[in-house]
A protein has these predicted regions:
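Electropositive, glycine- and tryptophan-enriched low-complexity nucleic-acid-binding patches
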Residues: 59, 77-81, 142-220, 304-318
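Active-site-proximal, Lys/Arg-enriched surface segment
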Residues: 85-175, 289-293
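Short, conserved catalytic/metal-binding motifs centered on acidic residues
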Residues: 52, 66-69, 113-127, 155, ...
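A short acidic (Asp/Glu
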Residues: 127-130, 233-240, 256-262
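Short amphipathic alpha-helical "interface-anchor" segments enriched in bulky aromatics
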Residues: 20, 117-123, 271, 279, ...
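A short, flexible helix-boundary coil/loop motif
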Residues: 1-44, 172-188, 194-204, 209-213, ...
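Short, positively charged, Gly/Tyr-enriched micro-motifs
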Residues: 33-103, 112, 154, 159-164, ...
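Acidic, His- and aromatic-enriched active-site or binding-groove loops in soluble protein domains
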Residues: 245-256
């Protein structure tokens, strides 16, 4: 074994980069090629630039700070060109990387645990007048008023332990701040960015079904699709069923949308006809006590479905499952997991830069949102496979400290060896020292992806 191999073998057991290990596991280089990320567009390897963006997010560094403090960073123009490149397929990159991660955690699932796909949307405030894709009068549940914002519809994966981001679309309403024809980039009609831009005026339900179909076609597996009452329309649920995905949802109490067969056609009428004859079970959610019962009902479009009527003493909530074999208690417990994604959005904003994109060009916004979600998935996966799972916030801070400490420590060590090598007598006595320094430096950069200035 040569000197190089001895050094690398010794360092491999000490100098471990969890992020780089995950990227290697999911074969990120292959995914980048499949997603049309090629070096010739920006002049640098796409893998290296992606890695730098991940480090910026995990280490909580602004791009300018990262460039200033890392001797291996590229010029700022390289990063800007990268996120504005119209030929890159960011959607495919996110879906394929998510599918690869989900395949890695598949053996960790226990019998009886449901794997869920969740469709939801979030609103990210954007005050700038010229931000492409942003709209006026977007309702924010957080602020309880209409604001200027991006409306992001997303497809997420969740189980009993983790959540992952699979796909997303930006939805633009009639109060858009800029027409699509006024967007900065003039795109070729066959480019990936043009295809992505064209979907912006589609309805939320259409975007959701398209995302679901793409995920299933790319190998994402799940037991149920969870949606809130906005998406719970018979035609939407029918299309999801046709894709082989049973739906669990809360229903809007709207007799125009939901009309059933038989004598009692509305949800209120069905509830009133059954409430005295059905056995009711009780439950507790926080401080709220409730009673519920379930019934199998015939619907003109969906056929036999199971409805769960949950009464808190004040409000009547109705849930639907197109899988009629599942118990009412399990339907309620499964639907509660839809709220996992709210914590996911919170982590994305607080830890991974979602909503803090300093770009107004549509292609750059798509790229930065994708990078935030991709980094979230990497950290979530690291948390999942650790023996002592933490909250993402705790793990995020650990990774931030670990990466920076490794980089600075190795840089200092190499500088010390370099100073030693400058002493003439030492170099004479140990001809391999310069070679050792070169190998240490090269291997450290390979393992970490960057080197900090000490």
């Amino acid at each position: 074994m040569g000197l190089d191999n001895y050094i690398q073998t010794a360092m491999r057991s000490i100098l471990r980069n969890p992020i780089l290990e995950v990227l290697t596991e999911i074969k990120i280089t292959k995914i980048l090629k499949q997603s049309n990320f090629v070096k010739r567009e920006v002049g640098y390897p796409p893998f290296q630039i992606i890695l730098h963006f991940v480090y910026m997010l995990v280490m909580n560094k602004r791009q300018s700070t990262f460039i200033k403090n890392s001797e291996n960073a590229f010029g700022k123009d390289a990063y800007y060109r990268f996120i504005k490149e119209s030929r890159y397929n960011w959607r495919k990159f996110l879906i394929l990387s998510s599918a690869a991660i989900l395949q890695r955690i598949k053996p960790l699932h226990k019998n009886g645990e449901h794997r869920l796909l969740i469709i939801d949307d979030t609103v990210e405030p954007k005050r700038g007048k010229f931000i492409e894709g942003s709209c006026k009068y977007v309702w924010s549940n957080k602020e309880h008023k209409s604001i200027n914002a991006l409306n992001i519809v997303s497809l997420n994966y969740a189980d009993s332990h983790s959540t992952f981001q699979v796909d997303f679309s930006i939805k633009m309403n009639d109060s858009k701040r800029k027409e699509i024809s006024e967007f900065t980039s003039k795109l070729h009609h066959r480019s990936n960015s043009y295809q992505r831009k064209s979907e912006i005026i589609k309805s939320k339900n259409t975007l959701a079904i398209e995302m679901l179909e793409r995920a299933l076609n790319n190998g994402v597996e799940a037991d149920y699709l969870l949606v809130d009452s906005w998406y719970a329309k018979p035609n939407f649920i029918e299309k999801a069923n046709e894709l082989g995905m049973p739906v669990i949802s809360r229903l809007p109490n709207n007799k125009l949308i939901w009309n059933f067969k038989g004598k009692h056609k509305t949800m209120n009428a069905i509830y009133e006809s059954l409430k005295n004859s059905r056995h009711k079970s009780g439950g507790q959610h926080g401080k709220i006590s409730y009673k519920y019962f379930d019934a199998i009902i015939e619907h003109a479009v969906l056929g036999k479905i199971k409805l769960v009527f949950l009464h808190t003493g004040k409000d009547l909530l109705v849930f639907i499952s197109t899988d009629i074999t599942i118990a009412g208690k399990e339907i309620i417990a499964t639907y509660k997991k839809r709220w996992n994604i709210e914590q996911g959005y919170k982590d994305l904003r607080n830890l991974f830069g979602l909503g803090k994109e300093e770009n107004r060009i549509y292609e750059a916004l798509i790229a930065k949102i994708t990078l935030s979600m991709f980094t979230y998935n990497i950290v979530s996966y690291i948390n999942r496979i650790k023996h002592e799972p933490q909250t993402l916030g705790e793990l995020f801070r650990d990774l931030e400290c670990e990466l920076e400490t490794l980089a600075i420590s190795m840089q200092l060590f190499i500088q010390i060896l370099t100073k030693i090598s400058e002493i003439q007598n030492v170099v004479k006595d140990n001809k391999d020292l310069l070679n050792i320094i070169a190998v240490l430096s090269a291997y450290t950069k390979k393992q970490l992806g960057f080197m900090c200035e000490s």
